């Protein structure tokens, strides 16, 4: 445990990029700041629910930013999460969202679930001269629900 704590703040081991397990502490920092300044301060987007297709992103958004509408996981071709029980997918049909993905490109498997998707921003986090995380943020319109 001591080694992990030291590695988190004073990298001693020659680990770079995604091979460093302590990057998890840092990888969402840019995303949180970018969402706060770009999405939550934009009047046209601030009323939209933030969604993702993996549970970690909404959990991080809810913890650090506490949006008006709770960020949720849609669980499309993904295991059910706590959000699946709190938010009935049928009640979300027709809604527009801010969608966050953990890669730069919009995921192909998600495209059929929305009428359109527009890029809002790309958030990149580097540590020790290596990119450790890329997140893309999208405006998605007219959620079709589970297909």
Label the predicted regions:
Residues 1-26:
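Transmembrane alpha-helical segments
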Residues 9-12, 56-64, 99-102:
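A broad, low-specificity signal for short, low-complexity segments enriched in glycine/proline
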Residues 14, 18, 44, 51, ...:
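A near-ubiquitous, low-amplitude feature marking generic local secondary-structure context
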Residues 14, 39-41, 119:
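Generic signal for short, ordered secondary-structure residues
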Residues 21-81:
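Short periplasmic/luminal acceptor-recognition loop of GT-C membrane glycosyltransferases, typified by
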Residues 80-147:
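Aromatic/acidic, Gly/Pro-rich catalytic loop(s) in extracytoplasmic/lumenal soluble domains
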């Amino acid at each position: 445990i001591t080694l992990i704590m030291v590695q988190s703040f004073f990298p001693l081991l020659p680990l770079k990029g995604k091979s460093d397990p302590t990057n998890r502490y840092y990888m969402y920092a840019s995303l949180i700041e970018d969402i706060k300044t770009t999405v939550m301060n934009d009047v046209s987007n601030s009323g939209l629910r933030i969604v993702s297709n993996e549970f970690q992103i909404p959990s991080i958004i809810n913890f650090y930013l506490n949006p008006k509408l709770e960020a949720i996981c849609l669980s499309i071709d993904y295991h059910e999460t706590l959000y699946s029980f709190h938010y009935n997918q049928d009640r979300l049909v027709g809604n527009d969202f801010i969608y966050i993905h953990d890669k730069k490109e919009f995921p192909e498997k998600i495209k059929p679930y929305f009428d359109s998707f527009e890029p809002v921003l790309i958030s990149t986090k580097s540590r020790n001269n290596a990119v450790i995380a890329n997140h893309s943020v999208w405006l998605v319109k007219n959620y079709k629900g589970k297909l």
